[in-house]
UniProtKB/Swiss-Prot annotation:
Name of protein: Large ribosomal subunit protein uL30
Family: Belongs to the universal ribosomal protein uL30 family.
GO annotation, cellular component aspect: cytosolic large ribosomal subunit
Source organism of the structure: Pseudomonas entomophila (strain L48)
Domain of life, source organism: Bacteria
Gene, per the UniProt record: rpmD
CDD domains membership: Ribosomal_L30
């Protein structure tokens, strides 16, 4: 299955609680942290919800 690189580029401090949980669910911990996640509908949904804090490649 294809993977997607996701990087946290903005802080989760002061954000909507559900968006914070999406970032946590993707495995991101701090600004500049990059993870590779599988390109599934569940992960795409989390990325789309918190898109303004993330950089997505692939």
């Amino acid at each position: 299955m294809a993977t997607v690189k996701v990087t946290l580029i903005k802080s989760v401090s002061g954000r909507i609680p559900n968006h914070k949980l999406c970032v946590k669910g993707l495995g991101l911990r701090r600004i500049g942290h990059t993870v590779e996640v599988q390109d599934t509908p569940e992960n795409r949904g989390m990325i789309n919800k918190a898109y303004y804090m993330l950089k997505v490649e692939g």
